[in-house]
């Protein structure tokens, strides 16, 4: 009952006593004094309590009667009575008295009132024990106080706050989980009335509430926390201002002394926000201020707090308070690392609880995914993956893209987290399909990306990819049918690079299995020095295939010792790597070996971990005979149309083709698993299919696995032979090759079989029907290579009479004059395809013979050289198209390179033929350069080619296409590292060292560059700069480390060459001078790049006698062949642009029909000023621009390029001077063959212009030179100077032509130096030079 609601009595109650001056007690109650016993006192008090309980406010007489008693009960005797029951009964009486006498209290003294209420408050502690017999009376006391709001009378007291604080503390301390809701409600009523009806809440009172929200208190008494929470919710309107004042004092003014809770402000804000965000309406702006604090730790605390506020599930703070949200996002870029880390950790909860904020977070996470701190990049991945695992819809493609990027992070921990995270997503959404097809489609790229990582050099990456494949992409613990279905459709849906990576993975695992098998074989042999040396080498090889090869070596040695001592362990390992080991057996073996090596006393056993890595790599956990059978059944279902191909997102044709490709790859690594009639029957069915690729793969599988068909499966053999014969005679070229090899591999009577193919094919060759020639030529070539003893002689007549005389030396058809230097495979004419196969046949025939007794190799090399010199047009009848010539040049260069892999033929390849072959890497056709470089690298990296062929890569410095130069550099790095590693692993004699030590490439490179057709004048600075760039292209890679004083060794080689003569032309002084000049440039580069080359070389290098004569006695060559000025120019002058070769297929102007220089200023696509061309500095700039443009792409060019020049208008210029000028003579006399230095280019739209130009060209133009061009043209004698008129008509017939810099990009424009005299005169009179602008920009 509210005091204010009660009517005041007619007379004042205070001080009124009974008429006789004695205290009136209720009937039956005797006087209560200190003279009676406690029990008696309790008995009498109970009756008093009953009387007061039954009284109401309207009983005026009774109120008057019992007033003395009310005053008596408030005496010190009762308030300080030691008996708690007495105190409880008195408190109940007092509570009723306040109720009865409301709104006035019968007590006038403020001190007395304070004592009474403190007394009552102390009695409320009895509420704590609900099992107490007196609990009901305590509850009655609470109920009475709450109902009447008795404590509100204390507002009149000056120090009422002490009472309220004591009350609040008491109630919060006694509340517990045994109280029912009524107790809590009465407490709430009591406290809320004090808060809401008072003049304000003091800090101490507020502390008594807020302290219950602090985590430590919250954990001790959950009920007090709940009570405080409900109280705050109920009083939010009143208490909000008090809370705001508190936080303002602490956060803004820094007055932490205002409260003992100051150090818990952030915990309190979090709890208050969770209770009711309205409690903090005025506090949030203060947090924004704190986010910008100069103290990093303070910012960190605020970020932690706001992360919880923004990230909590029901929070709408981000939308309600955008300024604070934006300010918080800014902390993602905080300078303090822990703040950025905390921000990133928050993002995970935010993404999961507030997907609508993902857009805001994406940009900030993008920046943090590139954070310099490893921990932050790692946590970005964890954040995104955690959210994605909860629900893929929570993360957008961009966020997943950040994880994708981090799979290539420089730190292993980050890469591992990214890869494992993606793998888990793939398994969850693609393999298990937990969120439907749409989600599976969203992450379908993961499988490809993870497999692409197998291309990385790090062994850790490779091992993790293997683990991911075995556990996530195709889980090895699935049943065989399910596992193979998973693999079948995975393989069909992978992109080509991922397929290659997966194939490489199986290949590496198989190779490691073979290393372990060879190690076990060595254990079976008697101990010897050779055996120990071989075993050590094998252990080092195995260690390289494990993480941390340094530590792995020790562990592998230890494992090898255990193998030597434990025969049972060896047998387990032999079973594991046995071709017949099943997947289940493999699992048992791995567990058994691990159990034997485990040490119970050593919980972390790095040795065991390393052995497990090895076992996991070699164990056949996916493929066995049962698995192959399941794969074949799946493929059969696809053929029959009963498979789930479409449902799995793969077309039946793709499934069949990919399935067979998969089987083909597995036939290399697990051939034994294929040996069953059922499998071979299915493969025979594939052989009869119309799909050429399917049939080809089936033949390959027979070739790899069919060694026992003849003895074990005669029925399969009888069916297979006629099919193979038919494929060898009339199948595709690839089928024919595989069919011949298959017959040779699996049949004992192969001579008879091959003869039945050879004889009819050799008799039916007809050059007039080239489309029917290709397959027979492939079959004949491979037959002669596989069975040289039987077919070498009959093939000789075929080669002489048909291949060379009839096919290669005749052009039966006229090529399409489309101006392109390269055409797609399907557009190449059958005749040229036949000629390419004829060249390959010559090589295969010679590779089969492996001797040069008949001098056939010399004849073949001369033929191939002639083809290179004639640019692919061997007959020189000009009937063949440019693109066909490119094909034939590539075939000829590749053929020489192939023959060089056979020692007997390498010896007879002359330096001139080697140089011609080398210049193919500078061909004008981009695709020729590209394919030739790939073939060269492939042979070098397998150590099949002699070291001199690595020198060819030096010429790649002249390639204008950045990608080609980068590829060449990577090839050099790979080759050099492989050779050095091979030398480390295989100690060898000095003679063999000459062919492997990478530094020995220097003399070959020097000799090759000295004979470069572009190097015509040994003192020309531009030409020397080209030489320097080529030398540095190679030397930069060689000089990365100064291993074994290699810098001094290379310097010594160059010095020694100056003491010899060029073996190619020992008596030609000009040739030797060029050789010595290149040596001086090399010495200049080595000395300038290394301070370590002045020491003496520990070894005296041996120079190849094929290229250099023996040093003459007493011959001293200390002459410097480059001047000091030139030396300075080479080292400190403006760097020579790399772009000196055609990046695209833009041929040089050919004899016969020549390009025209159009001087009209009306043509579009030109912005070149003639003066610019004549200005050397402008020319250099234009070359650099052209070179840069080249790096943007590759395109095809026209056969007759048109150079379009826009001349700046000048007064008094005769219009006649702007007419079309035939640049034929200028081109022959003045265009440099410096692979693009001022070379003609087709402007944008030149394909259309060319047709018009062809119509305008005077067909009776200058006659073709009497002698055709051969190879590259040398640099013009007048390079860099004005063209001399008397040189214009001189034909240039020496060297292979190089591509032009103008070929660098489609529509590129260049400033050629082929200028007609009139244009030059015009340029001299023209206005000041304008800056040349590359149209590509």
Swiss-Prot record:
Tissue: Highest level in colon. Low levels in lung, ovary, breast and kidney. Reduced level in renal tumor tissue. Isoform 2 is expressed in kidney.
Positions of post-translational N6-acetyllysine modification: 1146, 1211, 1290
This protein's record includes keyword Cell division: yes
Main localization, broad class: nucleus
Keywords annotated in UniProt: Acetylation, Cell cycle, Cell division, Mitosis, Nucleus, Phosphoprotein, Repeat
Sites bearing Phosphoserine, chain numbering: 1097, 1195, 1305
Localization per record: Nucleus
Positions of region (Disordered): 1150-1337
Record field: compositional bias (Basic and acidic residues): 1321-1337
InterPro entries: ARM-like, ARM-type_fold, Pds5
GO cellular component, one term: chromosome
Annotated CDD domains: PDS5
Sequence positions bearing N-acetylmethionine: 1
Composition-biased stretches (Polar residues): 1159-1180, 1223-1233
Subunit record text: Interacts with the cohesin complex. Interacts with WAPL (via FGF motifs) or CDCA5 (via the FGF motif); the interaction is direct, cohesin-dependent and competitive. Interacts with SMC3. Interacts with TP63.
Family, similarity comment: Belongs to the PDS5 family.
Note: HeLa cells with a reduced level of PDS5A show a mild defect in sister chromatid cohesion. HeLa cells with a reduced level of RAD21 show reduced association of PDS5A with chromatin.
Function text: Probable regulator of sister chromatid cohesion in mitosis which may stabilize cohesin complex association with chromatin. May couple sister chromatid cohesion during mitosis to DNA replication. Cohesion ensures that chromosome partitioning is accurate in both meiotic and mitotic cells and plays an important role in DNA repair.
Protein name: Sister chromatid cohesion protein PDS5 homolog A
Source organism of this protein record: Homo sapiens (Human)
